[in-house]
UniProtKB/Swiss-Prot annotation:
Pfam families: SDH_C, Shikimate_DH, Shikimate_dh_N. HAMAP family: Shikimate_DH_AroE. It catalyses: shikimate + NADP(+) = 3-dehydroshikimate + NADPH + H(+). Shikimate binds at residues 14-16, 61, 86, 102, 216. One of its GO terms (molecular function) is shikimate 3-dehydrogenase (NADP+) activity. The active site is at 65 (proton acceptor). This is Shikimate dehydrogenase (NADP(+)). Keywords: Amino-acid biosynthesis, Aromatic amino acid biosynthesis, NADP, Oxidoreductase. Homodimer. It comes from Nitrosomonas europaea (strain ATCC 19718 / CIP 103999 / KCTC 2705 / NBRC 14298). Transmembrane segments: none annotated. InterPro entries: Aminoacid_DH-like_N_sf (IPR046346), NAD(P)-bd_dom_sf (IPR036291), SDH_C (IPR041121), Shikimate_DH (IPR011342), Shikimate_DH-bd_N (IPR013708), Shikimate_DH_fam (IPR022893), Shikm_DH/Glu-tRNA_Rdtase (IPR006151). It comes from the Bacteria. It is an enzyme of class 1 (oxidoreductase).
Length: 276
């Protein structure tokens, strides 16, 4: 039986095993998929140990996407552009292929599942870590009017801007630099919701905007609750993105892209009723 895992710290909350079990059932594959907690200082060793036991591939989550980029011996074009990796495929040659499916997962969820075209929109992306890195190029490829990147440490946002210097419609700054500005879409790519915290968002930033949290929960995340209070026009968490990016990983491993709408509904039901 082929074995796969999601690796992170923390990772016990991950719904990736639930999702991939549904994909396997849907496509007639027999796999074992588990969640693997890696010590913060032993990511590489944990990955290599998993491969030695016969592991075929991995998904990578917080906080290891940059380390995964470094560990990969070969990269897809989208992982190379992002300089962050969220999927490994272990090749028979011994190589580790690194991919990044975050961006395509986000775009499919927002544009297809939620029917929100990004062309011509003003977008604010909060965060400059691995999650943000993976979605910048796919967002830019949708031709928004503006992509602003806000981060507590502006230098990190500037570094991302330089990665995509061929695009002139990127701006960066601290959160407070965007006070009083209007955005059509505000995306939380920080891990703050994992810790029941909030990025330092200016007052009234969300008014009439579409607020999207890349994390997911059975209830409104702190980010989405703030957006609701501030008058956001629409709220969405990252459950759909999680399923869509997982489908891309499944395609990389098995050569078939599973249907996602049913699994998104199943995930929503599971979040509300965890024993289902």
């Amino acid at each position: 039986m082929d074995t796969y895992a999601v690796i992170g710290n923390p990772v016990a909350h991950s719904k990736s095993p639930f999702i991939h079990a549904r994909f396997a059932q849907q496509t007639g594959r027999i796999i074992h998929y588990t969640a693997l907690l890696a010590p913060l200082d032993r990511f590489e060793q944990t990955v290599l140990d998993f491969r030695k036991t016969g592991g075929k591939g991995m998904n990578i989550t917080v906080p290891f996407k940059f380390e995964a980029f470094t560990l990969a011996s070969r990269l897809t074009d989208r992982a190379s552009a992002a300089r962050a990796v969220n999927t490994f495929r272990f090749e028979e040659t011994g190589e580790i292929l690194g991919d990044n499916t975050d961006g395509v997962g986000l775009i499919r969820d927002i544009e297809v599942n939620l029917n929100f075209p990004l062309a011509g929109k003003r977008i604010l992306l909060m965060g400059a870590g691995g999650a943000a890195s993976g979605v910048i190029l796919p967002l830019l490829q949708q031709q928004p009017d503006l992509l602003a990147i806000a981060n507590r440490t502006p230098d990190k946002a500037v570094s991302l801007q330089r990665q995509f210097a061929s695009y002139s419609n990127i701006t960066t700054g601290h959160y407070h630099d965007f006070a009083g500005q209007h955005f059509d879409l505000i995306i939380n790519a920080t891990s703050a919701s994992l810790h029941n915290e909030l990025p330092p968002v200016p007052a009234d930033l969300f008014r009439n905007a579409f607020a999207y949290d890349m994390l997911y929960s059975s209830r409104l995340t702190p980010f989405l609750e703030l957006a609701r209070v501030q008058g956001a026009g629409y709220l969405a968490d990252g459950a759909g993105m999680l399923v869509e990016q997982a489908a891309e990983s499944f395609l990389l491993w098995h050569g078939i892209r599973p249907e996602t709408q049913t699994v998104i509904r199943q995930l929503r039901d599971n979040l509300r009723h965890p024993t289902s």
